[in-house]
A protein has these predicted regions:
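Polytopic endomembrane small-metabolite transporters, centered on the Drug/Metabolite Transporter
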Residues: 1-258
Length: 258
């Protein structure tokens, strides 16, 4: 997913929030479409008291996604996982505070190894071209993204009871609520005007942005549901361990999905 997202952001670096909004709307549309095909997918009723209870998890989700998108836009795709490398250690810390429990020493050792790898990855490298070196702001974006993703993973477990323990209902609330929050930010960032100007330009190929939004929106939706199921069945920390393993395998594979 990261190389595909990066390809779209390279084609439209001035439209990060609009791109994110497109993905969220596609997820909501897919949920509505799936609900017509099978009774197992139920769209929740939009009730104010439920919205208030889910406001923290929805807000943390969209803030994390925004920082995540900004980080990916500003760094090379190969460096993105390093910039976000603190997800696992921060999830362990946040989960520890939230549950008032201490993970095993092996978990802390794993967190220490990952932290050391992160610090090594962001340290200056004289062999790296200046143009390829990540900026300080992009590293900060990555750290903030990691922090909010960690908090979000912990909040998911606590939010499921408000959605009848349904990952589908939580996915719907999360994507719809996030889209509502990011919509005014698109206007404030002037991205509608930017999109109109670029669409009128003969030099800009809008196909990468449009088709990329559709493809990554579909796969992003599937990953969202899979992640919620993983946290529901296991725990935030276990979910992050499995996610890191998958990302490592994906990093070693060629970028053939771009």
């Amino acid at each position: 997913m990261s190389p595909s997202n990066k390809a779209v952001l390279n084609a439209a670096p001035n439209l990060p929030l609009l791109y994110l909004f497109n993905q969220l709307v596609i997820a909501v549309i897919l949920l509505h479409g799936t609900s017509f095909l099978t009774p197992k997918v139920q769209i929740p009723k939009l009730e104010a008291h439920t919205a208030r209870k889910l406001a923290p998890v929805v807000t943390v989700n969209i803030v994390g996604l925004i920082f995540n998108t900004f980080c990916l836009r500003d760094v090379e795709a190969s460096f993105f996982q390093i910039a976000r490398g603190m997800v696992l250690p921060l999830t362990i810390v946040v989960s520890s505070f939230h549950t008032s429990s201490q993970p095993s020493s092996k978990v802390w050792i794993a967190a220490g190894i990952v932290t050391l790898g992160f610090l090594t990855g962001i340290s200056p490298n004289k062999d790296l071209p200046v143009t390829a070196a990540p900026s300080m702001i992009s590293i900060i974006y990555g750290l903030l993204s990691s922090l909010f993703i960690a908090i979000h993973a912990v909040l998911i477990k606590a939010s499921l009871p408000h959605c009848n323990n349904s990952t589908i209902e939580l996915a719907y609330w999360t994507n719809l609520g996030s889209a509502v929050i990011v919509a005014p930010l698109i206007l404030l960032n002037g991205e509608i005007g930017t999109f109109v100007d670029q669409a009128r330009s003969a030099e800009w190929d809008s196909r990468t942005f449009v088709y990329g939004s559709m493809v990554t929106g579909v796969f992003g939706f599937l990953l969202c549901v899979a992640g919620l199921l993983s946290i529901k069945i296991t725990s935030p920390i276990t979910h992050m361990f499995s996610s890191v393993s998958v990302l490592e395998c994906g990093t070693e594979a060629p970028f053939t999905d771009v």
